[in-house]
């Protein structure tokens, strides 16, 4: 499977952070995002070809994170702390506008059959 583009990673990363309370450790994002994109463990552990011994997937997520910082959706490392990715107020607003979570209460008891109205 081919890796998604950096641009394709940005919104799922923003929503992943939002859905986990707005602040996460960087290392906790790589695997869940990889699963969103259908990457296998093997694909997520392919190393960069530059002899730095860093997974290519982690590097791609970090670049997407940098773009979110540039958009002012995430705090930079000086503001949030090294290894912590934290949404800004603008990032929270953006995530809320994109979020598909629905806060709907469903009744516990739903009749199994419904009667159709009779036509006279």
Where do the model's predicted regions map?
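Minor-groove-contacting beta-hairpin "wing" of winged helix-turn-helix DNA-binding domains
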Residues: 81-88
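Conserved, well-folded catalytic cores of nucleic-acid-processing
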Residues: 36-40, 71, 101
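Short, hydrophobic-biased segments on the C-terminal half of alpha helices
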Residues: 65-66
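Short, amphipathic alpha-helical interaction segments positioned at domain boundaries
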Residues: 89-120
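Basic nucleic-acid-binding interfaces
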Residues: 31
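Short, positively charged loop/turn segments that connect secondary-structure elements
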Residues: 2-4, 34-62
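A short, conserved structural fragment
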Residues: 69-79
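Positively charged, polyanion-binding regions of nucleic-acid-associated proteins
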Residues: 2-28
